[in-house]
Amino acid sequence: MADGNEDARAEDLPGPAFENYEAMELACPAERSGHVAVSDGRHMFVWGGYKSNQVRGLYDFYLPREELWIYNMETGRWKKINTEGDVPPSMSGSCAVCVDRVLYLFGGHHSRGNTNKFYMLDSRSADRGLQWERIDCQGIPPSSKDKLGVWVYKNKLIFFGGYGYLPEDKVLGTFEFDETSFWNSSHPRGWNDHVHILDTETFAWSQPITTGKAPSPRAAHACATVGNKGFVFGGRYRDARMNDLHYLNLDTWEWNELIPQGVCPVGRSWHSLTPVSSDHLFLFGGFTTEKQPLSDAWTYCISKNEWIQFNHPYVEKPRLWHTACASDEGEVIVFGGCANNLLVHHRAAHSNEVLIFSVQPKSLVRLSLEAVICFKEMLANSWSCLPKHLLHSVNQRFGSNNTSGS
């Protein structure tokens, strides 16, 4: 489950038995790292990942594959749904997106190794039960891998990089073996800089012929799409965790490296990079070459080509291998991840906390709702005057749990 192949990894341990996973129903997801989270703007969907075993001590194990957790970004409430159908195996390091409320899931690492299987789930049928569907795509797929990135553009999912097995077929791009993976595995792995396209209308794989100087192979990097540009920042390659910034023109397939002005974030892997406007990206957390977890946040201004450090109240809450999703209200919702060095042999500090970053001004409706809640005792007798949908939001918020807001 590491961003390369170092120390003891949970992926090398026996698969868990899930029948005694939780004796009590949880009001929120279990703590985890290496999960996926995607958003439709109002809801965040969380699946997969792994956590520490409370019984067997140092052992980590994958979380139940049937569980999909849905977080209401307006009310701060969680809901668990047990999915059915072609349910993916329990995994970490998968790659996921949400397009028109359809969840797409590719790759990852499970108890038997890496995979290159592709799944989809239509969240619009949540009231009738959610069904996973495994898609047998046409064309030559990417190699089996995890810790890769993805951009969404028009009807295409564009995947980049990752850590996994040598491709079985001839592909465009570079693959570099991780020499340490030969020591403890019969299936050595490595990093790559491959770009693969999946057309969501035909479900056919293809590879573009890119121009320009491509980034080095890497894994545990972060990708974000703004317009026709696919940005990638950082990630791990061999012993280095990098802080380089590139974008791929998703119309012309030309790579460009960006050299920002002024101070830049330190090199890192296992961080998040989230589009928050047509001109800004939001960076949070990660893990340095010196194996230090990070709690810093930055905004990158595309038009000015500069990084600006973002002040926030979570400086004592470092996170790595977490997830981050943007809401329609100008917030970035960070969930889960690890607060310490998960590569060492003592227990990893996995989290199930929600951190909320306000990166855009709040709407008047949002400010009004927060005022109503803040002065609830004074205004409670007037709640009946609220429109039904606003009254519902107010009532829901009083049941919120496990959130922190800026």
Swiss-Prot record:
Record flagged with keyword Ubl conjugation: yes
Post-translational modification (record): Autoubiquitinated by the CRL2(KLHDC2) E3 ligase complex.
GO annotation, cellular component aspect: Cul2-RING ubiquitin ligase complex; nuclear body; nuclear membrane; nucleus
Keyword Flavoprotein: no
Pathway: Protein modification; protein ubiquitination
Pfam family for this entry, one: Kelch_KLHDC2_KLHL20_DRC7
Gene3D superfamilies, per database record: Kelch-type beta propeller
Kelch repeat windows: 31-85, 92-136, 148-207, 221-259, 271-311, 322-359
Record keywords: Kelch repeat, Nucleus, Repeat, Ubl conjugation, Ubl conjugation pathway
Domain of life: Eukaryota
Example of a GO MF term: ubiquitin-like ligase-substrate adaptor activity
Localization: Nucleus
GO biological process, one term: proteasome-mediated ubiquitin-dependent protein catabolic process
Role, per record: Substrate-recognition component of a Cul2-RING (CRL2) E3 ubiquitin-protein ligase complex of the DesCEND (destruction via C-end degrons) pathway, which recognizes a C-degron located at the extreme C terminus of target proteins, leading to their ubiquitination and degradation. The C-degron recognized by the DesCEND pathway is usually a motif of less than ten residues and can be present in full-length proteins, truncated proteins or proteolytically cleaved forms.
Subunit description: Component of a CRL2(KLHDC2) E3 ubiquitin-protein ligase complex, also named ECS(KLHDC2) complex, composed of CUL2, Elongin BC (ELOB and ELOC), RBX1 and substrate-specific adapter KLHDC2. May form oligomers as a KLHDC2-ELOB-ELOC complex; this interaction is autoinhibitory for the E3 ligase complex as the substrate-binding site of KLHDC2 is blocked in the oligomer. Interacts with CREB3; interaction is direct and specific as it does not interact with CREB1, ATF4, ATF6, JUN, FOS, CEBPA or herpes simplex virus transactivator VP16.
Name listed for the protein in its UniProt record: Kelch domain-containing protein 2
Source organism of the structure: Mus musculus
Lineage of source species: Eukaryota, Metazoa, Chordata, Craniata, Vertebrata
Name of the gene this protein is made from: Klhdc2
